[in-house]
Amino acid sequence: MEVKAIHRGARISAQKTRLVADQIRGLPIERALNILAFSPKKAAGIVKKVVESAIANAEHNEGADIDELKVKSIFVDKATSLKRFTARAKGRGNRIEKQTCHITVTLGN
């Protein structure tokens, strides 16, 4: 049994989010949530919400036992970036790209 949760367009870069995702890949749910709860990174809070959503999906849709679940796979893909401009000297402007990502979490036995 596999349960999936996806967060599309998370407002953080994929590179920063992958650092957190690599820490919990393959771990039991309880241990993964502890790591995410005590991590100081902004991405940890976002990934924790996606993992909790996957747990809720497992309970509601599949009637699964939470103690048996572990993070089967987690991956982070680059999404479209938000284009912004910032003012520079002499009336010019530079483009700033605010990165977004897609976070996919799969839980299984």
Swiss-Prot record:
GO terms for cellular component: cytosolic large ribosomal subunit. The keyword Ligase does not apply. GO terms for biological process: translation. GO terms for molecular function: rRNA binding; structural constituent of ribosome. Belongs to the universal ribosomal protein uL22 family. Part of the 50S ribosomal subunit. This protein binds specifically to 23S rRNA; its binding is stimulated by other ribosomal proteins, e.g. L4, L17, and L20. It is important during the early stages of 50S assembly. It makes multiple contacts with different domains of the 23S rRNA in the assembled 50S subunit and ribosome. The globular domain of the protein is located near the polypeptide exit tunnel on the outside of the subunit, while an extended beta-hairpin is found that lines the wall of the exit tunnel in the center of the 70S ribosome. This is Large ribosomal subunit protein uL22.
